[in-house]
Regions:
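Multi-pass, polyprenyl lipid-linked donor-dependent membrane glycosyltransferases
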Residues: 37, 68, 90-97, 120-150, ...
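Juxtamembrane segments of multi-pass membrane glycosylation machinery
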Residues: 51-55, 64, 68, 72-96, ...
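Membrane-proximal stem/loop segments at transmembrane-domain junctions that anchor or position
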Residues: 221-305
């Protein structure tokens, strides 16, 4: 077979080696570099809570902040600061997470397809620039996807594995509330492979246990049972405004622009999210062509990271 003639596993290993070395070079170049945009905010919120001896979000932040952002990741950073007292080593943590994610994705593609496809996948993963540069910033993306794909990789007809899978995917949702998009494909997968109904119980027990623990934790630190981010509206409005350029721009939040909210302290984060969402949808309805036109630009910027 073709993949045997070209020693596909060996080629995949070579690409992994180059990929790991490239990440180490990036870490060296950007070691302790200042963070920007979301990464800067994550560090700011985590450091603030760490210095005040609390967890995120605090009760007052539901009123003072424009949104509540990915508490699962920020609380990880707070715990990390309790150990290292500096953000310098976050890229090393990211390198470990990225390696774990690649292993999980290799396992998933091997299980769904075959070893040859899994090796091709590894090669494609390693040449994607964003999968190299992602180790540098302090962002939630890699943390979220590692939990998510490790959860999916654990899905098999073993009660303990399914319990762990449920725990991981529930925490992944605490990091970024997007796991609902993956639950339906997971359901079809286990349905296709005719899992016994008892395995469903193990999986949903894991989800239920972790969700309950997170709700109790959140109630203890700020008196609310909300465990998801309120970023849907603000994320949408960043890509749905007259100054759209395919990436983040703060022009949208300047006075007179669609993202500007008069007297923001009068609204809590849920109300602000609703305002951003309704304005975004209204703009998209009025400018569907412009919104669609920038999709390729967004994809290109995402690839380049």
């Amino acid at each position: 077979r073709f993949e045997k003639k070209i020693h596909l596993p060996l080629i995949a290993l070579i690409f992994i080696g180059i990929w790991l070395l490239s990440q180490i070079v990036f870490i060296g170049i950007y070691w302790d570099a200042p963070q920007y945009s979301d990464a800067s905010n994550f560090q700011k919120w985590a450091l603030d809570c760490y210095q005040k001896g609390c967890w995120y979000p605090r009760a007052e932040q539901f009123q003072s902040e424009p949104y509540i952002c990915y508490a699962g990741y920020i609380n990880f950073l707070i715990a990390y600061l309790h150990i290292f007292d500096t953000f310098k080593f976050v890229p090393i943590i990211n390198l470990l997470l990225n390696s774990l994610q690649l292993f999980a994705l290799y396992h998933i593609s091997k299980k769904i397809c075959n070893p040859a496809i899994a090796h091709y996948f590894v090669i494609l993963y390693c040449i994607l620039f964003s999968n190299i540069s992602i180790v540098v910033p302090t962002t939630s993306d890699l943390f979220f996807t590692t939990f998510l794909f490790c959860s999916i990789a654990l899905i098999r007809e073993k009660h303990l594995f399914l319990l762990l899978s449920g725990l991981l995917i529930a925490y992944a949702n605490y990091i970024r509330p997007f796991t609902i998009l993956f639950l339906l494909p997971i359901f079809f997968y286990v349905l296709y492979h005719k899992f016994n109904w008892k395995y469903y119980i193990s999986y949903f027990c894991g989800i239920g246990i972790m969700t309950l623990l997170l709700i109790l934790f959140n109630y203890r630190i700020n008196g609310t049972t909300n465990i998801v981010a309120t970023t849907s509206g603000i994320n949408l409005i960043i890509g749905a405004n007259d100054d759209i350029n395919g990436t983040y721009t703060n022009k949208v939040f300047q006075k007179g622009k669609i993202g500007y909210i008069e007297n923001p302290s009068e609204y809590n984060v849920f109300q602000k999210d609703s305002i951003y969402m309704s304005r975004s949808i209204g703009w998209i309805k009025e400018n569907p062509g412009k919104y669609i036109l920038y999709t390729p630009v967004k994809m290109a910027r995402l690839w380049w990271a």
